[in-house]
């Protein structure tokens, strides 16, 4: 099974443990890197051609406006295809109760009907929000994901690895049945 770890993440000012802090690596990117260490797939960062501001408050306003307008921001370095992948780990921070609009652009760009998707989400208290319902509109096979408080990603590595081992075990069981 060929795996893709696709994620959206942002560095700069982030809401981190109750306060705004400057981060060099976004929380979702940290989580994506942990997943890649264990699952050893191809990794793709979903990036906007015109990224949001590094200033947290400006970024929030931009994200809210994009969400309100149901925008589909143009992505840079877009993948040509996902046809070779069977499993996709899709990561994102919770923006406005769902995925960032750039993730919707990514989802609009490909056919996910024969893909198994494992979502992973970072947040500061809002969990997946309604992102799983939104994701199921694009992907027919969304499996159990993981949501992690972004400011605690570094402390949750064991929990993340346990989730990934469970996925590996379930996939092995499915292969034995078939």
Where are these regions (language model features)?
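Short amphipathic alpha-helical segments and helix-helix/interface helices
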Residues: 32, 103-108, 132-135
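Redox-cofactor binding/interface segments in oxidoreductases and associated redox assembly factors
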Residues: 90-91, 119
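Active-site catalytic pocket residues across diverse enzymes, especially alpha/beta-hydrolases
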Residues: 39, 110, 139
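Solvent-exposed loop/turn segments at secondary-structure junctions
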Residues: 11-13, 49-51, 94-98, 124-127, ...
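Short, glycine-/small-residue-rich phosphate/pyrophosphate-handling segment
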Residues: 113, 118-155
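N-terminal beta1-alpha1-beta2 submodule of the flavodoxin-like/Rossmannoid cofactor-binding fold
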Residues: 1-87, 97, 104, 158-178
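Short, conserved loop/helix-junction motifs that constitute active-site signature segments
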Residues: 82, 108-114
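Short, highly charged low-complexity linear segments
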Residues: 67-70, 91-93, 149-155
